[in-house]
């Protein structure tokens, strides 16, 4: 029988096309996985027979193919089983077979082994053992295959296999940061993916509990309710992986940003005012993944307990409801929560209060998972349950652990239904990397760390403030509710206050405490916005902020919540510069609150000048050294710069006020990350654009800029710049900046135009529409330009260039980068901005240029 490769290749292609057509018409994932296996079985059997292999050999499917599941672009894993080592002629024939695999268009992974070699490999590698466990004979010697299966099964130690697979899962979880909620999860390998389901079946098969959900149910491994849930999750993940393979025409199991929107549209999701289509898709994914991780934990613990009955320890009674088994919390009665729903929250209190407990037994987890249904409106209204919930919030230890456990088991979202709505909700806003519920728990974790002595070195100011705060547990309540209204459309800070007030009243908080928590939720973004976007040297800014906070308690609570919130957004968002800005605002506000008076411009200037003169004396400079420079500076300069900066500028410039050459001075930032840079030169229209271009080329991002023109026509500009690549070479960069920037300004070299660089995939696939607004400031002398745009190389240069073209003059710039998102504020004047048409023209042009 000859091998017609072309005919087989055509058959493979036709089968694949027919499978896709059938799936699109029926939406039957199980049928697709089964039918693809059957089609491949048929093709491989034809190929095997056409090459006239000896009857002593066997061809078997292994891995997912052996299990009977072949996704559209899955690899096909084969085992060619030999009775003894292959002869030279057989080896040649096997090589021809492998060549034909590729010729007919199948991606095949294969191994050629004797039975003994299979057993040896299985003993050394748990992955090989797992693949062989699912072997299925395709064609060839049935007796040889039966011998292989019998010996493989005879060598299998179910307990050892269980422990190895559990360890393998732990290692896999570590590769994916131990979370199902990553921005771009792998629907096969990530926690909560298909692999978690397969692990259950592998262990069940090795232990003889069955290879279907129904068989696991019959053998008491899984309950009816859990079986229904797992079947639903498995079906969802199967469909997702199938659609991903068909959409891309190749094997790809990662839900990359590049695919999420297209896949969401494929599922019929439509973007609305509250959520992008991709966010809706991912919320469904995360909720399924969460269910899989919970049930995987329960079922693995259950099978582990069944495999080691002799290791059962004598329970130690904790109270009427609970006992300790080993170091795990166990319920004394399987029907505890049905009989006494009050015990649901007591379970988490027991975990919080008992230092010796490290987890819960499988039956406790299972009972709690089932007990979610007991959390009804009546349960939520019960004073005892409300008291227990408040006790959890007020605990001395284990707060974050237990709230995470409650969230994982679905208890938290049932007790607080509005929290349940944001579980698994991702925010494709270019800076959040956690789902809303995970972000809230991160914020609670940060607040908890402020109270712990072992983290005092990391959060010194926060640790001191929280130790002074009365009833610091109120911050956990504020954290729990600060983002609870995300995804509803509208202002989540405002909408969240309604939920917060209702919770506080229902849970017996005093009027004073309720007012504080509601105020924190309403204003949780304010301190961050003031610190990062407004001029903290302006007494009016500080006075307005003090009017909002009112007293020390509100200021301290808001500072702590703001710090915890920013750090809980993304590891990339926080840096020491933002920490310094927040601390500066806090210190200025607390100083004036303690003095009982709002800051006044004349008092601030006198204080700064006196302090600057005191600092100058340390350098053995005369008492009048400052006079020549300061005569050229107006009050705005002294309001915008600290005493330390004023002294530095004076020290550097007092002897060259009329210098013909530019003066550039740089130094490590005295109060945070990065470098401080001062530029002094005769003023010119495009100076800011030139400087921005230089820093962009040098790999530095400007986070703060103060632009000033002296009375005699010199620019005195100050910058704080951060190294994008975080290189540890400040000394070399100081010398480089001072020399290179001076030379470029002196010789009027062509402007450095920053390279456009590559956009991140996140920016590319979830672009945000630029927002630009220009409004007059409160004094009526300047205009405030605010913009929000996707961050990218050259963004600030684009803004500077556009302002120059429109004849607008820049006074200050506050540059805030939140992950991949830029939120910048500029104080500008000139350019006929008092004319409404000119303002609109500048806004329109900026929006056009800032589009991705």
Curated annotation (Swiss-Prot):
EC number(s) on file: 2.7.7.59, 3.1.4.-
Segments for region (Uridylyl-removing): 318-675
Catalytic reaction(s) noted: [protein-PII]-L-tyrosine + UTP = [protein-PII]-uridylyl-L-tyrosine + diphosphate; [protein-PII]-uridylyl-L-tyrosine + H2O = [protein-PII]-L-tyrosine + UMP + H(+)
Domain HD: 436-555
HAMAP family given in the database record: PII_uridylyl_transf
Originating organism: Dechloromonas aromatica (strain RCB)
KW Nucleotidyltransferase (keyword) present: yes
SUPFAM superfamilies linked to this entry: ACT-like (SSF55021), HD-domain/PDEase-like (SSF109604), Nucleotidyltransferase (SSF81301), Nucleotidyltransferase substrate binding subunit/domain (SSF81593)
Family membership: Belongs to the GlnD family.
InterPro entries: ACT-like_dom_sf (IPR045865), ACT_dom (IPR002912), HD/PDEase_dom (IPR003607), HD_domain (IPR006674), NT_sf (IPR043519), PII_UdlTrfase/GS_AdlTrfase (IPR013546), Polymerase_NTP_transf_dom (IPR002934), UTase/UR (IPR010043)
Disulfide bonds: none
Cofactor: Mg(2+)
Pfam family, one: GlnD_UR_UTase
Function, as annotated: Modifies, by uridylylation and deuridylylation, the PII regulatory proteins (GlnB and homologs), in response to the nitrogen status of the cell that GlnD senses through the glutamine level. Under low glutamine levels, catalyzes the conversion of the PII proteins and UTP to PII-UMP and PPi, while under higher glutamine levels, GlnD hydrolyzes PII-UMP to PII and UMP (deuridylylation). Thus, controls uridylylation state and activity of the PII proteins, and plays an important role in the regulation of nitrogen assimilation and metabolism.
UniProt region (Uridylyltransferase), positions on chain: 1-317
GO BP annotations listed: regulation of nitrogen utilization
Regulation: Uridylyltransferase (UTase) activity is inhibited by glutamine, while glutamine activates uridylyl-removing (UR) activity.
Coiled-coil stretches noted in the UniProt entry, renumbered to this chain: none
Keywords assigned: Hydrolase, Magnesium, Multifunctional enzyme, Nucleotidyltransferase, Repeat, Transferase
Gene that specifies this protein: glnD
Domain (ACT): residue spans on this chain: 676-755, 784-852
Domain comment in the entry: Has four distinct domains: an N-terminal nucleotidyltransferase (NT) domain responsible for UTase activity, a central HD domain that encodes UR activity, and two C-terminal ACT domains that seem to have a role in glutamine sensing.
Name of the protein: Bifunctional uridylyltransferase/uridylyl-removing enzyme
GO MF, one example: [protein-PII] uridylyltransferase activity
């Amino acid at each position: 029988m000859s091998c017609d490769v072309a005919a087989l290749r055509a058959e493979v292609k036709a089968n694949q096309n027919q499978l896709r057509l059938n799936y699109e018409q029926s939406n039957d994932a199980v049928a697709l996985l089964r039918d693809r296996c059957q089609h491949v079985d048929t093709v491989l059997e034809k190929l095997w027979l056409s090459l006239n292999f000896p009857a002593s050999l066997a061809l078997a499917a292994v891995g997912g193919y052996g299990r009977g599941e072949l996704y559209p672009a899955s690899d096909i894993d084969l085992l060619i089983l030999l009775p003894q080592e292959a002869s030279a002629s057989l080896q040649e024939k096997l090589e021809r077979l492998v060549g034909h695999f590729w010729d007919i268009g199948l991606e095949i992974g294969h191994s050629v082994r004797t039975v003994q070699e299979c057993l040896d490999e299985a003993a050394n590698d748990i992955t090989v053992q797992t693949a062989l466990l699912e072997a299925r004979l395709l064609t060839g010697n049935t007796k040889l295959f039966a011998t292989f299966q019998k010996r493989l099964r005879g060598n299998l130690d179910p307990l050892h296999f269980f422990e190895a697979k559990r360890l393998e899962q732990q290692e896999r979880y570590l590769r994916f940061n131990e979370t199902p909620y990553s921005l771009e999860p792998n629907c096969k390998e990530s926690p909560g993916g298909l692999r978690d389901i397969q692990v259950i079946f592998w262990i069940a098969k090795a232990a003889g509990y069955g290879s279907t959900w129904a068989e696991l149910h019959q053998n008491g491994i899984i309950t009816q309710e859990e079986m229904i849930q797992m079947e639903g999750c498995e079906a969802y993940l199967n469909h997702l992986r199938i659609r991903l393979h068909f959409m891309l025409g190749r094997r790809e199991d990662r839900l990359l940003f590049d695919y999420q929107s297209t896949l969401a549209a494929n599922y019929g999701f439509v973007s609305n005012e509250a959520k992008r289509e991709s966010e809706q898709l991912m919320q469904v994914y995360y909720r399924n993944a969460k269910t899989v991780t919970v049930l995987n934990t329960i079922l693995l613990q259950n099978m582990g307990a069944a495999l080691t009955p002799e290791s059962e320890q004598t329970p130690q009674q904790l109270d009427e409801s609970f006992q300790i088994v080993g170091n795990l919390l166990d319920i004394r009665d399987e029907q505890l929560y049905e009989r006494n729903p009050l015990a649901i929250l007591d379970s988490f209190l027991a975990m919080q209060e008992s230092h010796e407990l490290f987890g819960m037994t499988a039956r406790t987890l299972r009972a709690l998972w089932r007990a979610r249904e007991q959390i009804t409106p009546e349960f939520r209204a019960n004073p005892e349950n409300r008291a227990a919930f408040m006790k959890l919030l007020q605990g001395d230890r284990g707060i974050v652990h237990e709230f995470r456990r409650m969230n994982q088991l679905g208890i938290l979202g049932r007790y607080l239904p509005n929290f349940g709505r944001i579980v698994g909700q991702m925010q494709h806003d270019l800076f959040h990397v956690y789902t809303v519920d995970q972000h809230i728990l991160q914020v609670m974790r940060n607040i908890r760390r402020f109270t712990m002595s072992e983290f005092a070195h990391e959060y010194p100011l926060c640790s001191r403030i929280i130790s002074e705060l009365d009833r610091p547990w109120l911050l956990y309540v504020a954290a729990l509710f600060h983002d609870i209204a995300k995804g509803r459309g509208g202002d989540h800070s405002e909408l969240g206050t309604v939920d917060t007030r209702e919770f506080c009243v229902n849970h017996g908080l005093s009027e004073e405490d309720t007012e504080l928590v509601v105020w924190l939720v309403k204003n949780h973004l304010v301190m961050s916005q003031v610190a990062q976007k407004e001029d903290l040297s302006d007494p009016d800014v500080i006075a307005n902020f003090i009017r909002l906070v009112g007293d020390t308690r509100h200021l301290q609570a808001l500072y702590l919540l703001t710090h915890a919130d920013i750090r809980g957004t993304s590891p990339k968002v926080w840096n020491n510069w933002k920490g310094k800005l927040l601390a500066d605002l806090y210190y200025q506000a607390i100083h004036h609150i303690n003095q009982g008076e709002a800051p006044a411009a004349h008092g601030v200037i006198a204080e700064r000048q006196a302090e600057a003169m005191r600092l100058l004396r340390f350098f053995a400079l005369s008492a009048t050294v400052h006079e020549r420079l300061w005569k050229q500076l107006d009050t705005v300069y002294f309001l915008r710069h600290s005493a330390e900066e004023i002294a530095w500028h004076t020290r550097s410039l007092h002897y060259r006020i009329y210098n013909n050459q530019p003066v550039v001075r740089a130094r490590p930032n005295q109060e945070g990350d990065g470098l401080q840079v001062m530029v002094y030169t005769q003023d010119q229209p495009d100076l800011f654009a030139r400087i921005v271009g230089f820093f962009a080329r040098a790999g530095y991002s400007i986070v703060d800029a103060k632009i000033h023109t002296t009375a005699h026509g010199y620019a005195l500009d100050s910058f704080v710049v951060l190294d994008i690549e975080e290189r540890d070479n400040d000394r070399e960069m100081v010398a480089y900046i001072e020399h290179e920037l001076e030379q470029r300004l002196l010789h009027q070299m062509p402007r450095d135009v920053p390279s456009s660089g590559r956009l991140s995939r996140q920016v590319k696939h979830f672009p945000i529409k630029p927002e630009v607004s220009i409004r007059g400031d409160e004094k009526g002398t300047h205009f405030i330009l605010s913009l929000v745009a996707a961050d990218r190389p050259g963004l600030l240069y684009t803004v500077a260039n556009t302002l120059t073209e429109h004849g607008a003059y820049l006074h200050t710039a506050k540059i805030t980068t939140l992950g991949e998102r830029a939120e910048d504020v500029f104080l500008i004047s000139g350019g006929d901005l008092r004319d409404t048409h000119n303002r609109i023209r500048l806004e329109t042009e900026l929006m056009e240029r800032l589009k991705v």
